[in-house]
Amino acid sequence: MDSPFLYNRYVTGQHFIGRKEDCSIMANLLAQNENVAIWEPSGAGKKSLVHQVLTKLKVRGEAFAVGEMTALDIRSGESFVKRLGAAVIRLVASTPDEYESIVKTHLEGTHWVFDRKAFSDMDMILSTNWDLDDRDLKAVLRLPYSLAAEKGERSFLIVDEFQNVDLADDGERIFKLMEEVMDEVKAEGLRIFSYIFIGSQVNAMEDIFIKRHFFYRRVTRLKLSKVDEREIVEHIIKGFLASGKVIDRDLISGACRLFKCNLFYINHFTSVCDSLSKGYIMEPVLLEALATVIAVNRGRFISMMNDLTSFQVSLMRAIIDGYTKFSTAEVIRKYSLNSSANVRRLKDALMKKEILTFVGEDGKPVILDPLFEYWLRNYYFKKEQ
């Protein structure tokens, strides 16, 4: 039987809760052929929201095609462009003859070819017969627009873990070429294709889109709202009732606060509770479920801390102790942080590791992973009795 608490894949329909306004905003952006970027920590529900919106558009009878690719393992710009091209070609074609026809027609005069042996051996749609230049790359980056226009149907391409393109030596080159193509097709009136960029590395995505201003006025950021705790509690109670189980509302509210309404952790936690219980679910079951979820993630958390320098660990300790300003003489002395210049370097390093981010005008530190924060507070930095 399907579990009501899904955490191993994105969810839509009855399993999707909250964020009605976010769904409405995204649907409107896509209707206006806008490019959308969503970045939130892992487990926040980014892909669930995207697919919920697309599902609702389908139900409303809207016709469109959706492609999906990941940049998770991308370490070169050319690899990204090649994968992007293959993803959009597969949107409109499905046979080697069709692939070859598209490459010959739309990429004529470039160094891209369709190699039947490469396709047979490695499922590779785009191969090259020479070193690629900017003209070659732009030709592929134009493909989504030209193919959508040729088919006469709106198309979307979901690019997951988009921030990893910036790990490539030529990442900035790819961003600039994408910007050029976006501007060119807009001037030509080819507004029938949209990107949906998704990123789980919050600081890396902000660096691309906000600090360095790539895709300025070309991509709209959709910041996900927090799912209301009451909606989560109701969803969990109904989920347990469906299997004849009862759980105290206050206990679930406490779990929501512990996980800071992170839907991945909450669904994992309640799924474990479900597997451990029959009938009325008491507090010991929740404690056992919490211990199980922590045990699953403990190795990852230890590895994260082992990867930090002593200074970085000290700054994390200061955050757990409740400090938000770290350049004062008191905090520098208490946590042996050396100097305010060193504090700046430590903050930058922890942001690059995607452990921290800083929000608001006062730059309040936020630990991005709520379970990691709980583990730090209650295990790693636990005060001696």
Which residues make up each language-model segment?
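Walker B catalytic acidic pair
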Residues: 160-162
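Amphipathic alpha-helical "lid/sensor" segments that cap RecA-like P-loop NTPase cores
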Residues: 234-299
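C-terminal leucine-rich, beta-strand-based interaction scaffolds used for sensing/assembly
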Residues: 2-5, 299-385
